[in-house]
């Protein structure tokens, strides 16, 4: 009987792709993949080491899953990822129950190390691995959606960020290799492709021939079967007109852009070493919205960088009120050893960081509510995910401006559809992050296939002020 392996992934979508590559490598080597750690002889934990809270979550997961080795059928516990790349020796001392530690440059070796009784306990080479279309990969999301990692590493030197030390420098994948992987995913049923990288807009700067992201996008759009292509982790420093035009003119590129801006105060932007000032950021946002009407912008901000004054924070708060981002997340600055920001004077107290985060999110909640209310009455294309977790009486899906895993959902309380089907939904209700609607049109080729309607719902209930059952 094949040895069973369970993968536990923490962190970002880029980490998820790494886990999928490891799963593919293990499956090709004959291992059987399972969803329950209690059934696995091998457990792999792919960690995140970006900020302190992520490191704590990773260690907690390792300790919890180590119970399976003491009390269950697990015979080998393997820990991989960014936390290992950064703290391998310390982890090895503190976690004797772990059999192997693999850094970010050793993902391709996971099957060999798991099967080799003589393999080293610490395998932490330079972080120079990048997978290709030929690398085995198992998509861990529903087959209709997938991530495509177009590059690995980062050449930026943001003062607060440890990622270049964990992932190495920028390494872009060739266009033909990315198209081949996208086509393989589409052949498996993927209709939504989310492009990710540490710095998406730096794509191609390390490749010969002056290849850039705006050259890649039209080639991906030619892949049969793909319907939606979305962009994540765009660095604002390098968004040329050609890229904006490609996003505006190609129908498969959804009107959604994830672009972390981090701050608006010029003093803080200089301290962060972001390379652009607030005038540039405002001009860029205006250019994007003018050229791509209806664009939904997601951004990430940092509060509490050392030296952030109340005036700096008020500048950021005004920026949020002014720009009215459709989606926004806020991180409390986490001092990371080995980064310039960790050595800066005037560290901000944790309580003040939390207060500033909460103030921004309170403002954003009202902005988000207004954006959502404006959706009522509109007809949107919705990618159906399946039955809602809350109740079988609802379908759950996402419209083109709701990214997987990080944004809200669109609940369907009237009509039927298949997981992976894109249907037209009329929006009937809205809350801060989620929408409710009814199916008003389906692709005739899909609608012809029989699917039982959901059971009639019980009396209406509300979710955060949202009447999800109509």
Curated annotation (Swiss-Prot):
Keyword Transmembrane: no
Gene Ontology biological process terms in this record: tRNA modification
Binding site for [4Fe-4S] cluster 2: 154, 158, 161
Note accompanying the cofactor annotation: Binds 2 [4Fe-4S] clusters. One cluster is coordinated with 3 cysteines and an exchangeable S-adenosyl-L-methionine.
Compartment(s) where it occurs, according to its Swiss-Prot or TrEMBL record: Cytoplasm
Alphabetized GO MF terms: 4 iron, 4 sulfur cluster binding; aspartic acid methylthiotransferase activity; metal ion binding; protein methylthiotransferase activity
Cited Pfam families: Radical_SAM, TRAM_2, UPF0004
Xref: InterPro entries: Elp3/MiaA/NifB-like_rSAM (IPR006638), Methylthiotransferase (IPR005839), Methylthiotransferase_CS (IPR020612), Methylthiotransferase_N (IPR013848), Methylthiotransferase_N_sf (IPR038135), NA-bd_OB-fold (IPR012340), Ribosomal_uS12_MeSTrfase_RimO (IPR005840), rSAM (IPR007197)
SUPFAM superfamilies in UniProt: Radical SAM enzymes
EC number: 2.8.4.4
Residues involved in [4Fe-4S] cluster 1 binding: 12, 48, 82
Domain of life: Bacteria
UniProt keyword list: 4Fe-4S, Cytoplasm, Iron, Iron-sulfur, Metal-binding, S-adenosyl-L-methionine, Transferase
Family annotation (CDD domains): Radical_SAM (cd01335)
The protein's enzyme class: transferase
Sequence similarity: Belongs to the methylthiotransferase family. RimO subfamily.
Name by which UniProt lists this protein: Ribosomal protein uS12 methylthiotransferase RimO
Organism for this UniProt entry: Anaeromyxobacter dehalogenans (strain 2CP-C)
């Amino acid at each position: 009987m094949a040895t069973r392996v369970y993968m536990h992934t923490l962190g970002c979508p880029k980490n998820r792709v790494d886990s999928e590559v490891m799963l593919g490598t293990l499956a090709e080597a004959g291992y059987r993949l399972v969803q329950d750690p209690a059934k696995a002889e091998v457990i792999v934990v792919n960690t995140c080491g970006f900020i302190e809270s992520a490191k704590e979550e990773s260690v907690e997961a390792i300790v919890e899953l180590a119970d399976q080795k003491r009390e269950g059928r697990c015979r080998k516990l393997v820990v991989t990822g960014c936390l290992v790349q950064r703290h391998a020796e310390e982890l090895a001392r503190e976690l004797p129950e772990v059999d192997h530690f693999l850094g970010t440059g050793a993902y391709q070796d996971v099957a060999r190390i798991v099967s080799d009784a003589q393999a080293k306990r610490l395998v932490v080479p330079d972080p120079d691995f990048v997978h290709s279309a030929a690398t085995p990969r198992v998509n861990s999301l529903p087959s209709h959606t997938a991530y495509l990692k177009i590059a690995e590493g980062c050449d930026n030197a943001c003062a607060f960020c440890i990622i270049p030390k964990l992932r190495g420098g920028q390494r872009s994948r060739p266009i033909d290799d990315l198209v081949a992987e996208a086509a393989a995913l589409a052949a498996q049923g993927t209709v939504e492709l989310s492009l990710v990288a540490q710095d998406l807009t730096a794509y191609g700067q390390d490749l010969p021939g002056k290849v850039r992201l705006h050259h890649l996008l039209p080639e991906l759009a030619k892949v049969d079967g793909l319907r939606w292509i979305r962009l994540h982790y765009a660095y604002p420093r390098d968004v040329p007109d050609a890229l904006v035009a490609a996003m505006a003119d190609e129908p498969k590129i959804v009107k959604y852009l994830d672009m972390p801006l981090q701050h608006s105060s010029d003093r803080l932007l200089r301290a962060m070493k972001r390379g652009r000032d607030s005038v540039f950021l405002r001009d860029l946002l205006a250019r994007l919205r003018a050229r791509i009407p209806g664009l939904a912008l997601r951004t990430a901000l940092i509060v509490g960088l050392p030296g952030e004054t109340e005036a700096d924070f008020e500048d950021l708060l005004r920026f949020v009120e002014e720009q009215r981002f459709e989606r926004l997340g806020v991180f409390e600055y986490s001092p990371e050893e080995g980064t310039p920001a960790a050595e800066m004077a005037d560290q901000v107290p944790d309580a003040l960081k939390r207060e500033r985060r909460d103030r921004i999110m309170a403002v954003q909640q009202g902005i988000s509510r207004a954006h959502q209310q404006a959706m009522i009455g509109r007809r949107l294309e919705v990618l159906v995910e399946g039955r809602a977790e809350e109740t079988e009486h609802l379908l759950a899906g996402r419209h083109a401006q709701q990214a997987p895993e990080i944004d809200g959902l669109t609940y369907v309380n009237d009509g039927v559809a298949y997981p992976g089907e894109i249907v037209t939904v009329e929006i009937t209700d809205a809350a801060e992050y989620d929408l409710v609607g009814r199916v008003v049109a389906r692709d005739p080729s899909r609608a012809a296939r029989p699917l039982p309607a959901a059971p009639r719902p019980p009396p209406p209930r509300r979710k955060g002020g949202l009447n999800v059952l109509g």
